[in-house]
Amino acid sequence: MPKMKTKSSAKKRFKVLGNGGVKRAHAFKRHILTKKTTKNKRQLRGTSMVNDRDLASVAKMLPYA
């Protein structure tokens, strides 16, 4: 059986943690930031965890993680 390929888009966006969780960045923080409030931009800093319902699809995209 051939090797499975990792989705390049997923390996750039997700980081698998030791406890089995997956870390991701927040959306809505790339451009058109002038109309967003300072509070909103501050809350979008840092990282978040992928929801439990989405873990299966992320795991399919990252077969060796």
UniProtKB/Swiss-Prot annotation:
This is Large ribosomal subunit protein bL35. Coiled coil: none annotated. Pfam families: Ribosomal_L35p (PF01632). InterPro entries: Ribosomal_bL35 (IPR001706), Ribosomal_bL35-like (IPR021137), Ribosomal_bL35_CS (IPR018265), Ribosomal_bL35_sf (IPR037229). Keywords: Ribonucleoprotein, Ribosomal protein. GO terms for biological process: translation. GO terms for cellular component: cytosolic large ribosomal subunit. It comes from Neisseria meningitidis serogroup B (strain ATCC BAA-335 / MC58). Belongs to the bacterial ribosomal protein bL35 family. It comes from the Bacteria. The gene is rpmI. Gene3D superfamilies: 4.10.410.60. One of its GO terms (molecular function) is structural constituent of ribosome.
